[in-house]
Regions:
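A contiguous strand-loop segment
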Residues: 1-147, 170-177, 384
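C-terminus-biased signal that marks the final domain/tail of proteins
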Residues: 1-60, 154-384
């Protein structure tokens, strides 16, 4: 969209005035960072029948929403964990952004310097949206990136259907689960997408909804009826069998599969939300986002104890052992040479009641849930 390009041009102009070597092309490229990372970590989809060795990628993100009968006072509550790598500059570059655009809705999101958005937030009309990485064989870089789509929704959506329309009309790049909620209407859906397909699932029988990093749009599963997105994820995750719901669920539990994204977190969210049903508050929501119990054994792990494997023992608030991604990297403008070694963990965690604008954000520690959740109010920040 031209208004976003204009905003990026303003960022580039400001950088130039500081003497930076970075220009508009760099800012544009930086705003595709998330999509480039997702795309790099995906298999080649040109031959869907081929066998391949996938690039291992970090596990990323999860969220839940609860309202009505699920919460203590009926208030719509939304929680999100942003999980990714602590690459150079990422931790010190975490930034809470309050945006009051000339045209559109005021909103808040967590981003990084130079980015117009990255992963969703809440807006002044009571809409929340967050993204969860969910790989598919249907990938492209010829479309709108996650940052652009997130910003479009936050700035323009007043209903869940508005978000669904935006994701339908604009071309998409990588596989993403968009968790969208409307606090006024007390409605939430998870829109599961890739470059080719889009489907959405509703809450199943109760006033709770959650998502992690795999598709759940499988006909007959949790009341869903529609296109099967799991078929396009089979090769991406090297799932053994997705011919039936039972075989698909067993494949997701495969602890020896090195490509799965800690699928036990989905089951753990269901367990915790069900146990707290009717009594969910912002405080108990923080406990859910900070949960470190093994989904299979119930064992509590220490903050910096890594799981046995990617799909064995990873928790909602997780921590992975450090990985060397490159022995030597030369940055193309600064000529800085360094190795890249990083943990996967929680970069930030948010709990919100979008209707009244209250939210609490943890982003000072790593993993972030170990630090304080600091209170803000969107309407106060916007001077409404």
């Amino acid at each position: 969209p031209p208004e976003f390009r204009e905003e990026m041009a303003g960022i580039a102009d400001a950088l130039a005035k500081t003497g930076s070597q970075l220009d508009l092309h760099d800012v544009l490229l930086w705003n595709t960072m998330y999509d480039s990372w997702c795309f790099f970590a995906h298999p080649n989809s040109s031959n869907q029948a081929q066998t391949f060795e996938r690039q291992k990628y970090p596990i990323g993100c999860s969220s839940f929403s609860a309202w009505g009968e699920a919460t203590r006072d009926g208030t719509f509550i939304f929680g999100k964990n942003m999980d990714n790598l602590n690459l150079p500059g990422i931790l010190e570059g975490r930034m809470l952004v309050v945006c009051d655009p000339d045209n559109g809705l005021g909103h808040v999101n967590v981003s990084h310097p130079g980015m117009i958005a990255i992963d969703g937030g809440i807006n002044e009309n009571g809409i929340e949206m967050m993204t969860q990485y969910s790989p598919s064989i249907y990938e492209t870089m010829r479309g709108c990136g996650i940052a652009v789509l997130s910003r479009l929704i936050l700035q323009n959506a007043s209903r869940v259907d508005d978000a669904l329309n935006i994701l339908t009309v604009y071309p998409r790049c990588t596989g993403i689960n968009y968790h969208v909620g409307d606090a006024k209407a007390q409605r939430a859906i998870v829109i599961e997408t890739n470059a080719k397909q889009i489907a959405f699932r509703r809450p199943y029988k109760q006033d709770i909804l959650w998502t992690t990093n795999h598709y759940n749009c499988y006909p007959g599963w949790m009341g869903y009826q529609g296109e099967n997105l799991v078929e396009g994820q089979k090769l991406a995750f090297c799932l053994k069998d997705v011919k039936s719901i039972e075989s698909w669920q067993e494949s997701l539990k495969d602890k020896s599969n090195p490509y799965l994204s800690a699928t036990g977190r989905f089951r753990q969210y269901e367990k915790l939300l069900s146990e707290l049903y009717g009594e969910i508050t912002m405080e108990s929501g923080i406990e859910i986002l900070s949960d470190r119990h093994n989904p299979d054994t119930g064992e509590l792990r220490d903050w910096e104890t890594a799981p046995k494997a990617r799909n064995d023992g990873n928790t909602i608030a997780f921590w992975a052992a450090p990985t060397t991604f490159a022995e030597k990297v030369k940055f193309y403008k600064s000529n800085l040479e360094t190795s890249i070694v990083a943990h996967t963990g929680n970069l930030w965690s948010m709990i919100a009641t979008p209707l009244n604008g209250d939210f609490r954000i943890a982003m000072s520690d790593f993993p972030a849930q170990r630090g304080p959740y600091v209170h803000f109010n969107l309407f106060e920040e916007l001077n409404r």
